[in-house]
Amino acid sequence: MTGAACQKNADCPFITNFNLFTNTVSDIYRIFAKRKLPYEALVGLNLINMTKKLSLLAIILWATLSLQARKWTPAEVRDVIRKVNTYWQQNNKAEVRSFWDNAAYHTGNMEVYKLLKDEQMLDYSIRWAEHNQWMGATEADPAKWKYKRYGEGQDYVLFGDWQICFQTYIDLYVLLGDESKIKRAMEVMGYEADSKANDYWWWADALYMVMPVMTKMYRLTDDEKYLDKLYENLLYSDSIMLDQETGLYFRDGKYVYPKLKSANSKKDFWARGDGWVLAGLAKVLQDMPESYIRQPFFVHKFTRMARAVAKCQQPQGYWTRSMLDPNHAPGPETSGTAFFCYGLLWGVNHGRLDRKEFAPVIERAWKYLTETALQKSGKVGYVQPIGERAIPGQTVDANSEANFGVGAFLLAACEYERYLRKK
């Protein structure tokens, strides 16, 4: 029994008889002092043999050392960021297409530049943007632009996977100037904002790919049509993917319960999909003005989702690929965990979430990201490959890396550095 299921079960021996593994050091002493952990219970915990060799003090010390979270400094976090990003950039060329997976990495890289002011890292994103001529999909004729199903062709101009690149192009324009950098973004997103259609975002990933583009376009133009279109498009997304009971999102209409169930007949919320959404909402609120009439709608959605996400975390700090059914595809996964960690950190850092309430969730997630996901080389492992659902039996291990997973890790790490400086 693990995770939320164990937390809700009064008969779970881990919870009722061995709370020291989730409490602070002072709680450990309190439990022993009040005799809430009788000697006989050690048998069931496979510690009886240890007591023959170690004193009770040694047992307490061992438990304390295993539980006590490392106390990070901002400088140490910055070192981790450099290690991860340097490893990625040294092993992967910048000159790749502007499709979503590469573009998601660059949203993390730009956050690194904002924090570290490392010109070499900035240059990596500039070279990527120049290679793609500051464009997503390149079809020139709006009459041929598509979006209603998945497509990697150059005519899928209105498909969100070809629009996430505009986030980085806009950021680079703000830093460096030159309107040629945003010419295509203005053309494509202006067309979408002016259109009568609102069914553009039919899969959860799009809420990270495009929602932040809309708020960045507002910042560029001071035109609320981008915010209004963001709201209208999101209402459509909610109508087909949002689970009203939990505040979480199904990946798309195919996965809505009970049409599709997890291996154990539960609602199948895909961690990376919901990670895209929570992170996207954080980015939206970053740029959305407090004065915008719909802003409370987005704040409520973000805070409700954050609490729903926190309830699904596993004791080891990660989220399983199927969030409510850990046994569907068991084991750690980094991309969803990193996006969740970023979203929760952003919420705390910007006063949208209570620090005391979410600090334990954040610290567990950060511990997983740095002690399990992060490899000695700087590689970020345990990233589920490109897909759209939790797949039973799929291999996800220390060698499983991906550009978007690195981007998610960098977002979380940058926000964690700020989190430490706010203490």
Feature annotation, model-predicted:
Residues 204, 215-323, 330-341, 353, ...:
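Extended ligand-binding clefts on enzyme/binding-domain cores
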Residues 72-103, 111-160, 166, 172-175, ...:
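CBM-like carbohydrate-recognition segments
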Residues 89, 93, 117, 133-138, ...:
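Helix-capping and short linker residues that terminate individual alpha-solenoid repeat units
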Residues 179-212:
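Asp-box/WD-like beta-propeller blade repeats and closely related beta-sheet repeat scaffolds
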Residues 1-6, 13-17, 21-24, 28-72:
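Bacterial Sec-dependent N-terminal signal peptides
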